[in-house]
Amino acid sequence: MNFDTLKKFDEEIYEVIQKETKRQRGSIELIASENFVTTAVMEAMGSQLTNKYAEGYPDKRYYGGCEEVDVAENLARNRLKKLFNAEHANVQPHSGANANIGVYFATLEPGDTVLGMNLSHGGHLTHGSPVNISGAYYNFVAYGVDSVTHRIDYEEVMRVAQEAKPKMIVAGASAYPRAIDFKKFREIADAVGAYLMVDMAHIAGLVAVGLHQNPCEYADFVTTTTHKTLRGPRGGAILCKEKYAKIIDKAIFPGLQGGPLMHVIAAKAVAFKEALEPGFKAYQEQVIKNAKALGEELKKQGFDLVSDGTDTHLLLIDLRNKNITGKDAERLFDEVGITVNKNTIPFDPQSPFVTSGIRIGTPAVTTRGMKEEEMKKIAGVMNIIIDHPEKVSEAQKVVDELCNQFKLYE
């Protein structure tokens, strides 16, 4: 993209953009929630649509002059519905968190009981963490994973649900590497008369191409981010049954937000169109192949994987046998240009600020064109960093070679 005007007016911000672009080009991005959007998505985000206020919804705006942005929002809504075979879509949430809070606001009263996945077992802040508005406003009861298999025990979820009698059950995770059985969650919700909400933010791209069970078949409400595996701009969306359309739309506007970000909604529409293209399935298939290949090679190098592997795009690594914390590992990897994030593991003895694990994923490296052979090299680099720090120059060389071979935004 051309930043000539910005360079002349605000050299400081121009420098930030240039340095961040250089960082992205010169590092291996393994944070599971990050990806690289296309130039088309960025062009839509940087368009004149950023100038338009459009409170309300298409054909029901509180401002004049919304004819063109109505077209953009309808394109985004219709493409998203087609992508997930959903009855209704709201593309206005500014984030996945706003999408989640919007569903709660539409369906719950303060103090209502909700079942959500324990944050330290792979859930998300907005699934009832006491430091989040979800945990402060609602009575969240947590379910987790089995202490041995580190997988969701659906019989235990049923037991907790029958005991807690929640008004809503939230399924979905931010650090759970295995496929989630939404049909079983529907059965549990029906058994206790609860709404079922699925947060598919991490796996939306996999769901879109049929590589993971589609929650829209089972859930009353499905929330998502539009980035991560979906590879769109940063934002959120809600899918629901048509009978809930009015309460969801009302909860987002005027309930939670004011004016929608029309430039971001246009960029969402572009990303959804990309996801409807045949090549998007091949991309997602490679994401999973890469995650599995990376996991297998890491196991060969002596790393412990939570649940012993992955069905998705992400891996959770237990570093306790390596005698290093997630916090320290994140720093060491960052020094050679491998970006990961420290992450709690199930039943973690460390604090969330230190952690015993790291979370990694393959969406971004797959976007760059890397495949299974490159995953083996990356695993080798990770092993050097943790077990053979005296060979750090070798690791740096491999990182540089991979980044030079697989170009980004050039």
Curated annotation (Swiss-Prot):
Entry EC no(s): 2.1.2.1
GO molecular function: glycine hydroxymethyltransferase activity; pyridoxal phosphate binding
Primary localisation category: cytoplasm
Keyword entries, A-Z: Amino-acid biosynthesis, Cytoplasm, One-carbon metabolism, Pyridoxal phosphate, Transferase
GO cellular component: cytosol
Segments forming a coiled coil: none
Residues that bind (6S)-5,6,7,8-tetrahydrofolate: L119, G123, H124, L125, S351, P352, F353
Cofactors, names only: pyridoxal 5'-phosphate
Signal peptide positions (record): none
Residue numbers bearing the N6-(pyridoxal phosphate)lysine modification: K228
One GO-annotated biological process of the protein: glycine biosynthetic process from serine
Known pathway: One-carbon metabolism; tetrahydrofolate interconversion; Amino-acid biosynthesis; glycine biosynthesis; glycine from L-serine: step 1/1
Places the protein is found: Cytoplasm
UniProt cross-references to InterPro entries, sorted A to Z: PyrdxlP-dep_Trfase, PyrdxlP-dep_Trfase_major, PyrdxlP-dep_Trfase_small, Ser_HO-MeTrfase, Ser_HO-MeTrfase-like, Ser_HO-MeTrfase_PLP_BS, SHMT-like_dom
Chain positions of site Plays an important role in substrate specificity: H227
Reactions mediated catalytically: (6R)-5,10-methylene-5,6,7,8-tetrahydrofolate + glycine + H2O = (6S)-5,6,7,8-tetrahydrofolate + L-serine
Family as reported in the entry's similarity comment: Belongs to the SHMT family.
Assembly information from the UniProt record: Homodimer.
Function: Catalyzes the reversible interconversion of serine and glycine with tetrahydrofolate (THF) serving as the one-carbon carrier. This reaction serves as the major source of one-carbon groups required for the biosynthesis of purines, thymidylate, methionine, and other important biomolecules. Also exhibits THF-independent aldolase activity toward beta-hydroxyamino acids, producing glycine and aldehydes, via a retro-aldol mechanism.
Protein name: Serine hydroxymethyltransferase
The organism of origin for this protein: Alkaliphilus metalliredigens (strain QYMF)
Upper classification of the organism: Bacteria, Bacillati, Bacillota, Clostridia, Peptostreptococcales
